[in-house]
Amino acid sequence: MTTTQIRTSTSTTPAPVAARRPVWKHGVAASVGAAVATTAIAALASADGVSFATEPGGPGIPPLGFAQLTLIFSLIGVGMAAVMARKARRPRSTFVRTAVALTVLSVVPDLTFGFDTPSAVSLITAHTVAAAIVVPTLAGRLSRTR
């Protein structure tokens, strides 16, 4: 009688893909963090007398408007990152280039819609802080090449 020994190989290191959470989970968390940060910036600026109005005495942007718009546009960025993760040849660099370009474009209204200087500076700061939270978080989840 002969016995056959079957060897099975086991890996002690988990597969990096299986251990990582998907892009969207980190993106949603970063979006919420960015919304909180931009709302805090708006609240601090408002407390310091910044109006966020395009004309003197006109209605300004409410602080919760910062949270709402930050969430909406950050989640659009999460969707872009998810699509680029599946379709782009170089997802990380494609996403970073696109996000930087969109961040630069996002400050154009702050400079051209007639905001006073403190309002424009606060809005640009809010855009920059939101991008500084969301973009590196998403870029870190994307692979360099597909």
Indicate where each model-derived feature is located.
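Internal alpha-helical transmembrane segments of multi-pass membrane proteins
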Residues: 23, 27, 82-103
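Core segments of alpha-helical transmembrane spans in multipass integral membrane proteins
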Residues: 63-82, 97-105
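Short, Lys/Arg-rich, polar N-terminal cytosolic tail immediately upstream
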Residues: 1-23
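Membrane-water interface at the C-terminal end of transmembrane alpha helices
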Residues: 26-30, 34, 129-146
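Membrane-helix boundary connector in multi-pass membrane proteins
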Residues: 108-122
